[in-house]
Regions:
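Flexible glycine/acidic-rich beta-alpha junction loops that bind and position SAM and/or redox cofactors
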Residues: 12-16, 35-46, 77-84, 100-125, ...
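Proteins enriched for Cys/Gly/acidic motifs involved in redox and nucleic-acid/cofactor modification
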Residues: 31, 53-64, 88-96, 105-113, ...
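Conserved, mostly hydrophobic/aromatic
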Residues: 5, 33, 74, 94, ...
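Terminal RNA-binding accessory module
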Residues: 117-209
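Short, electropositive alpha-helical surface patch
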Residues: 15-29, 82-99, 124-129, 158
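Conserved SAM/AdoMet-binding glycine-rich loop
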Residues: 1-84
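Extended hydrophobic-aromatic, low-complexity segments
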Residues: 29-31, 43-44, 67-73, 85-87, ...
Length: 209
Protein backbone atom coordinates (compact mmCIF):
# COMPACT_ATOMS: atom_id res chain seq x y z
CA UNK A 1 0.00 0.00 0.00
CA UNK A 2 3.01 2.29 0.33
CA UNK A 3 5.99 2.91 -1.93
CA UNK A 4 9.06 4.59 -0.47
CA UNK A 5 11.96 5.83 -2.55
CA UNK A 6 15.49 4.91 -1.54
CA UNK A 7 18.55 7.14 -1.34
CA UNK A 8 18.60 9.67 -4.19
CA UNK A 9 21.07 12.01 -5.84
CA UNK A 10 20.10 15.54 -6.84
CA UNK A 11 20.12 14.70 -10.56
CA UNK A 12 17.36 12.17 -9.93
CA UNK A 13 14.96 14.80 -8.55
CA UNK A 14 13.04 15.67 -11.69
CA UNK A 15 9.73 17.58 -11.99
CA UNK A 16 8.11 14.29 -13.05
CA UNK A 17 9.23 12.64 -9.81
CA UNK A 18 7.78 15.46 -7.72
CA UNK A 19 4.50 15.26 -9.62
CA UNK A 20 4.36 11.49 -9.06
CA UNK A 21 4.86 11.90 -5.31
CA UNK A 22 2.16 14.58 -5.15
CA UNK A 23 -0.40 12.76 -7.29
CA UNK A 24 -0.01 9.09 -6.30
CA UNK A 25 -0.90 8.52 -2.64
CA UNK A 26 1.01 5.23 -2.66
CA UNK A 27 4.29 7.18 -2.72
CA UNK A 28 5.60 8.32 0.64
CA UNK A 29 6.36 12.03 0.95
CA UNK A 30 9.82 11.08 2.14
CA UNK A 31 13.18 11.51 0.43
CA UNK A 32 16.58 10.36 1.64
CA UNK A 33 19.24 12.79 0.44
CA UNK A 34 22.73 12.04 1.81
CA UNK A 35 24.57 15.20 2.85
CA UNK A 36 27.63 13.33 4.21
CA UNK A 37 29.16 16.43 5.83
CA UNK A 38 28.03 19.95 6.70
CA UNK A 39 31.43 21.54 6.09
CA UNK A 40 32.48 22.63 2.60
CA UNK A 41 36.10 21.80 3.38
CA UNK A 42 35.21 18.25 4.42
CA UNK A 43 32.92 17.79 1.41
CA UNK A 44 35.82 18.80 -0.83
CA UNK A 45 38.10 16.31 0.93
CA UNK A 46 35.45 13.64 0.38
CA UNK A 47 35.47 14.53 -3.34
CA UNK A 48 31.77 15.41 -3.27
CA UNK A 49 30.69 17.51 -6.23
CA UNK A 50 28.48 19.93 -4.29
CA UNK A 51 28.78 22.32 -1.38
CA UNK A 52 26.47 23.18 1.50
CA UNK A 53 24.89 26.11 -0.35
CA UNK A 54 23.91 23.86 -3.25
CA UNK A 55 22.54 21.26 -0.85
CA UNK A 56 20.48 23.90 0.99
CA UNK A 57 19.00 25.06 -2.32
CA UNK A 58 18.13 21.45 -3.14
CA UNK A 59 16.29 21.03 0.16
CA UNK A 60 14.44 24.31 -0.39
CA UNK A 61 13.34 23.08 -3.83
CA UNK A 62 12.16 19.74 -2.45
CA UNK A 63 10.16 21.39 0.33
CA UNK A 64 8.48 23.78 -2.12
CA UNK A 65 7.59 20.97 -4.55
CA UNK A 66 6.26 18.51 -1.94
CA UNK A 67 4.59 20.24 1.04
CA UNK A 68 5.09 18.37 4.30
CA UNK A 69 7.89 16.25 2.83
CA UNK A 70 10.25 14.50 5.21
CA UNK A 71 13.91 14.68 4.24
CA UNK A 72 16.31 12.32 5.97
CA UNK A 73 20.06 12.33 5.50
CA UNK A 74 23.39 10.66 6.27
CA UNK A 75 26.23 12.37 8.12
CA UNK A 76 29.78 11.01 8.39
CA UNK A 77 31.70 12.30 11.40
CA UNK A 78 35.47 12.22 11.88
CA UNK A 79 36.60 12.11 8.24
CA UNK A 80 40.41 12.32 8.07
CA UNK A 81 41.59 15.89 8.57
CA UNK A 82 38.30 17.13 10.01
CA UNK A 83 39.13 19.93 12.44
CA UNK A 84 37.00 21.03 15.39
CA UNK A 85 36.08 24.21 13.50
CA UNK A 86 34.99 22.18 10.48
CA UNK A 87 32.95 19.87 12.66
CA UNK A 88 31.31 22.88 14.33
CA UNK A 89 30.51 24.29 10.88
CA UNK A 90 28.78 21.00 10.15
CA UNK A 91 26.72 21.24 13.33
CA UNK A 92 25.76 24.83 12.50
CA UNK A 93 24.68 23.91 8.97
CA UNK A 94 22.65 20.88 10.03
CA UNK A 95 20.92 22.95 12.73
CA UNK A 96 19.51 25.19 9.98
CA UNK A 97 18.11 22.30 7.94
CA UNK A 98 14.65 20.79 8.46
CA UNK A 99 15.78 17.15 8.54
CA UNK A 100 13.23 14.61 9.76
CA UNK A 101 15.90 12.05 10.55
CA UNK A 102 19.69 11.92 10.51
CA UNK A 103 21.75 8.77 10.29
CA UNK A 104 25.09 9.59 11.93
CA UNK A 105 28.11 7.40 11.24
CA UNK A 106 31.71 7.63 12.44
CA UNK A 107 34.23 7.53 9.61
CA UNK A 108 35.61 4.01 9.23
CA UNK A 109 38.80 3.24 7.34
CA UNK A 110 38.28 1.24 4.16
CA UNK A 111 41.41 -0.45 2.90
CA UNK A 112 42.56 0.75 -0.50
CA UNK A 113 40.86 4.14 -0.36
CA UNK A 114 42.84 7.42 -0.41
CA UNK A 115 41.25 8.52 2.88
CA UNK A 116 42.43 5.36 4.64
CA UNK A 117 46.04 6.18 3.73
CA UNK A 118 45.97 9.69 5.14
CA UNK A 119 48.13 10.44 8.16
CA UNK A 120 45.70 12.93 9.69
CA UNK A 121 43.17 10.41 10.99
CA UNK A 122 40.86 11.77 13.68
CA UNK A 123 41.60 10.07 17.04
CA UNK A 124 38.90 7.61 18.10
CA UNK A 125 38.01 9.46 21.36
CA UNK A 126 37.52 12.69 19.40
CA UNK A 127 35.49 10.89 16.76
CA UNK A 128 33.30 9.28 19.43
CA UNK A 129 32.66 12.63 21.10
CA UNK A 130 31.69 14.23 17.79
CA UNK A 131 29.32 11.36 16.96
CA UNK A 132 27.55 11.87 20.29
CA UNK A 133 27.24 15.61 19.69
CA UNK A 134 25.86 15.13 16.19
CA UNK A 135 23.45 12.45 17.43
CA UNK A 136 22.16 14.82 20.10
CA UNK A 137 21.46 17.39 17.40
CA UNK A 138 19.81 14.69 15.27
CA UNK A 139 17.43 13.84 18.13
CA UNK A 140 16.56 17.51 18.56
CA UNK A 141 15.93 17.98 14.82
CA UNK A 142 13.67 14.91 14.70
CA UNK A 143 11.59 16.24 17.59
CA UNK A 144 11.47 19.67 15.97
CA UNK A 145 10.20 18.10 12.73
CA UNK A 146 7.53 16.08 14.56
CA UNK A 147 6.23 19.14 16.42
CA UNK A 148 5.18 20.71 13.10
CA UNK A 149 2.48 18.06 12.69
CA UNK A 150 0.93 17.98 16.16
CA UNK A 151 -2.76 18.86 15.85
CA UNK A 152 -2.98 17.65 12.25
CA UNK A 153 -4.88 14.61 10.98
CA UNK A 154 -2.79 12.29 8.81
CA UNK A 155 -3.09 8.90 7.16
CA UNK A 156 -1.27 6.21 9.11
CA UNK A 157 -0.48 2.68 7.97
CA UNK A 158 -0.38 0.65 11.18
CA UNK A 159 2.10 -2.20 11.39
CA UNK A 160 2.58 -3.84 14.78
CA UNK A 161 0.88 -4.04 18.18
CA UNK A 162 2.74 -4.49 21.46
CA UNK A 163 1.15 -4.38 24.92
CA UNK A 164 -1.95 -2.63 23.63
CA UNK A 165 -0.06 0.06 21.68
CA UNK A 166 -0.04 -0.08 17.89
CA UNK A 167 2.48 1.83 15.82
CA UNK A 168 2.70 2.71 12.16
CA UNK A 169 3.88 5.35 9.73
CA UNK A 170 2.43 8.42 8.07
CA UNK A 171 3.13 8.92 4.38
CA UNK A 172 5.98 11.25 5.33
CA UNK A 173 7.51 8.61 7.55
CA UNK A 174 6.55 9.81 11.03
CA UNK A 175 6.18 6.99 13.54
CA UNK A 176 2.70 7.20 15.10
CA UNK A 177 1.41 5.32 18.14
CA UNK A 178 -2.16 4.74 19.33
CA UNK A 179 -4.01 2.74 21.96
CA UNK A 180 -7.16 2.66 19.82
CA UNK A 181 -8.36 -0.63 18.37
CA UNK A 182 -6.86 -0.86 14.87
CA UNK A 183 -5.87 -3.63 12.50
CA UNK A 184 -2.26 -4.13 11.45
CA UNK A 185 -1.74 -3.49 7.76
CA UNK A 186 -4.63 -1.02 7.46
CA UNK A 187 -4.65 2.75 6.94
CA UNK A 188 -6.50 5.09 9.30
CA UNK A 189 -6.94 8.84 9.59
CA UNK A 190 -5.27 9.75 12.88
CA UNK A 191 -5.20 13.02 14.79
CA UNK A 192 -1.63 13.58 15.99
CA UNK A 193 -1.72 14.78 19.58
CA UNK A 194 1.61 14.69 21.42
CA UNK A 195 5.25 13.68 21.17
CA UNK A 196 5.77 10.06 22.18
CA UNK A 197 8.98 7.99 22.14
CA UNK A 198 10.49 8.40 18.65
CA UNK A 199 7.31 9.79 17.12
CA UNK A 200 3.82 11.05 17.95
CA UNK A 201 0.87 9.61 19.86
CA UNK A 202 -2.58 10.03 18.34
CA UNK A 203 -6.14 8.81 18.09
CA UNK A 204 -8.06 7.41 15.15
CA UNK A 205 -10.57 9.71 13.48
CA UNK A 206 -11.54 7.66 10.41
CA UNK A 207 -10.75 4.18 9.13
CA UNK A 208 -9.89 4.01 5.43
CA UNK A 209 -10.46 0.28 5.17
Amino acid sequence: KRLRLGSLESIELSPDLFELIRSDERFCAHLHLPLQAGSDAVLKDMNRHYDTAEFARLIERVESEVPGVAVSTDIIVGFPGETEDEFQSGLDFVAKMNFSRMHVFPYSRRSGTPAAERQDQVPEPVKKDRVHRMQALAAYKAEEFHRQFIGQTMRVLFETTTDGITDGLTDNYIRVYTDDSVEDGEIYEVRLEQLYQDGIFGHVVVSNK
